[in-house]
Amino acid sequence: VLSSKTRLGLRVQEVVSQALILLTYYSLLGWLRFRRYRIPDLSGVRAEFAALERERRDGLLVCANHLTLIDSLIIQWALSPGWRLFVRPRWFIWNLPDRHNISVNGFMRLLGYLGKCVPVLRKGPPEETRRTLDKVAFLLSRGQSVLVFPEGGRSRVGRVDPERVMYGVGRMLQGAPAARVLCVFARGIGQREYGNYPRPGETFFVRLAAFAPETTFQGLRADRDLAMQIVGRLIEMEQEYFAHANLDR
């Protein structure tokens, strides 16, 4: 259970990041445009997300594939313009980046704070994992949106890798059973393997799928079952991408 101090800290971070969202969002958008990144069906993706959000009352767990260091940034850009995040705070998604990546320097720590990041220690001690799960459960219970990568890190094989699945995503759902799940598949068309940043001028393919995993198991078996269902849906979306998209492979 989270301490009152930790809960207050998350609420303060939410207020501060929300107050500065326009500055943060459009500064990062300027960098994305400088890199000449584009999402061809941006308006369509945003309209689909807006329709899903209009039906939502509880927390939203966004589950995505993971190939680069800026996947969370690409996904937030794809889902909503900055002005809409300003008027609809629940659309501004919390992230769970690796603590080592977000703590490189003071600027990155500040950017992470304003970007609603909750740094996590990969493969940390059990108490650290429990604290992270409690934070996610708290955020979801307040109707917030949280982005997670079920693989736990960037895929080393260039595709969704079921061998790397972390069952924490299943435990998050167990801790917030009312939360909805949104699977997001996002990939640069020129992406061959994992990397730090997509190539300049990259075009991104983004697809959404509302998902409602269920399980009859309990405990760890339930965590595993839910996590594998989510990853299975992401794999299906990836297969559709390679099978039907007209791509420059």
Kindly give the residue locations of the regions a language model identified.
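Membrane-anchoring hydrophobic helices of lipid-metabolizing enzymes
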Residues: 1-93, 104-116
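A cross-family acyltransferase "interaction/gating" segment
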Residues: 7, 106-109, 145, 152, ...
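A conditional alpha-helix N-cap/helix-loop micro-motif detector
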Residues: 42, 125-130, 162-163, 223
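Generic beta-sheet signal
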Residues: 58-64, 143-150, 179
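Hydrophobic/aromatic beta-strand patches that form the interior of the parallel beta-sheet core
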Residues: 96, 118, 180-184
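Internal catalytic-core helix/loop-beta-alpha segment
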Residues: 118-159
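A conserved mid-domain beta-alpha-beta active-site/ligand-binding segment of alpha/beta enzyme cores
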Residues: 205, 211-213, 221-242, 246
